Structure formats: structure tokens, C-alpha cells
Amino acid sequence: MVALTWDDTGKRQYEMGTDHGVLYPMTTTGTYGTGVAWNGLTAVTESPDGAEANDMYADNIKYASLRSAETFGATIEAYTFPDEFIPCDGGAEVTDGVVFGQQSRSKFGFSYRTQIGNDAKQDAGYKLHLVYGATASPSEKSYETINDSPEGMTFSWEIDTDPVSVEGHPELKPVASITIDSTKVDKKKLTALEKKLYGDTTGEPTLPLPGEVYTMLKAAA
């Protein structure tokens, strides 16, 4: 038997940062189109909701506690956004450089990366975050005069999601988010997934559906 210890060297982990943002616009057929790099990404705040307790009482005692369905939301912040995000933000580009607002909002997928560090190595690994079935809400844009300490304007969007079924795995509930830890996942499988997400010389970047992600990462090495 081994006694518990705390804060061993190399195990004082933390997460920070966000990078490698990718937008995957949803096509009219319900699939995700070619991914585009999202430059200027400054923050992603995940905001899950639901899973609230609904207590049941019988025989003058607490009999059971039921949990409501959980939903996934987030806030994306960035200095800029790709042109492909315009339809997702309720815009229609009627000709080059001319955008009509207050249009239907397209769905999209999204991926980004956060860094894992520890006391021994600041860049020990990273987590990939995949988001499905997202729609963006209108957000405030504040344009201010340039003064002696100018700052770039930050755009912000609150997103809601519709979960997607995990094909071939009825034991799993539909999901809207997947997180992959590079320090634990097989490196070859992770590389194959990243080729899908970011593209390479043999294929365009695309967002694999949850069932495909499961198969890629769960399959025997």
C-alpha cells in the first residue's frame, strides 16, 4: 500500500491560454464544411447550463434527486473573425465588402486549443476542444475614439449549441462538446485527428462528427 502525497514534482498541473481556433461552417446539407483559421482569438469561456437537481420527497424524507438535461454554451472573444463567420453572425455579403445585417444565422462547429503546464514544464501538453451545433447570438460592438492609449476593439459572441448523436454508440447521450488531452491520448491517433481538424497536403480541414472522433481515438493502436 502507498500513502497519498500531494504536489509532487511534475504533477502541479494547470491550464492557460487559448489558440489554434478553427471555424467549421455548417453546409445546407447539415455537414461541416472546410475549416478556416480563426485569427486573433483572445478567449473562450465555456458556460454549461442545466443539470439542476429536482428533489423528490416521500415518506417525509428526501426520496431521490433527478437532474435536468445539461446544455453547453460558451462565449468567444477575438480581435477579428474570418469572413466565413459573417453568415453565422447574421450577415449576408451581397457583394464583395457589402454586408446586410439582421439575416438568418447559420450554424457552425468550432475547435480551439488550451495549454497544459506544470511546475516542471510550462508547455507539457494541450487540450483540444471540439464544439458542435453552435449558433451565435447578436453582441454589442463599441467603437471608441482613438486617444493616447489606443486599444484594439474586442468582438464577443455568446453561443448556444444543439447536441449531436454519437453514431454507433447508443450508450452515450448526444454531445455538443468534446475535450481531448494530448498528455493522455495515443500520439499517432492524436496526429490523425489533427490532420482532420487542420488539414494537410492530402485533405482539407474538417470537423469529424463525434462518432468518428470516438472511432479514431478508441480504435486499437
State the predicted function of each range.
Residues M1-D83, V131-G152:
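Solvent-exposed edge beta-strands and adjacent loop segments
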Residues V2, V22, V36, V44, ...:
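Extended aliphatic helical segments
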Residues L4-K11, T27-Y32, A120-Q122, V164-P174, ...:
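Intrinsically disordered, low-complexity coil segments
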Residues T9, S47, S65-S68, S104-S106, ...:
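Generic serine detector
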Residues Y63-S139:
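Structured, beta-strand-rich domain cores
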Residues P138-A221:
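Mixed-charge, glycine-accented linear interaction segment located at domain edges/termini
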